[in-house]
């Protein structure tokens, strides 16, 4: 999707389960567009300001086991995805799956 979007196009994302999937999708979009110019920490901090909920804050308590596991997976996935995006702006030339095959 990112490859086909014009720079000024907007993306609207919504999920109603409260697990943080919308936030993660938006962070991934931000990473794909800005990894070449911003650090991972800068992108995450900006997204925390936009969405001050639990999704990106590992210091907030999560009592639901499913949410806790999802948070742990997220904290491992996002830095890896950032490295992919830094090497492949806008998801090019390698797809995520191709990059993983070379970097796993």
Curated annotation (Swiss-Prot):
Residues 57-70 have a biased composition (Basic and acidic residues). Keywords: Hydrolase, Virulence. The keyword Hydrolase applies. InterPro entries: Prot-tyrosine_phosphatase-like, Tyr_Pase_AS, Tyr_Pase_dom. Gene3D superfamilies: Protein tyrosine phosphatase superfamily (3.90.190.10). Belongs to the protein-tyrosine phosphatase family. This is Uncharacterized protein AvrBs1.1. It comes from Xanthomonas campestris pv. campestris (strain ATCC 33913 / DSM 3586 / NCPPB 528 / LMG 568 / P 25).
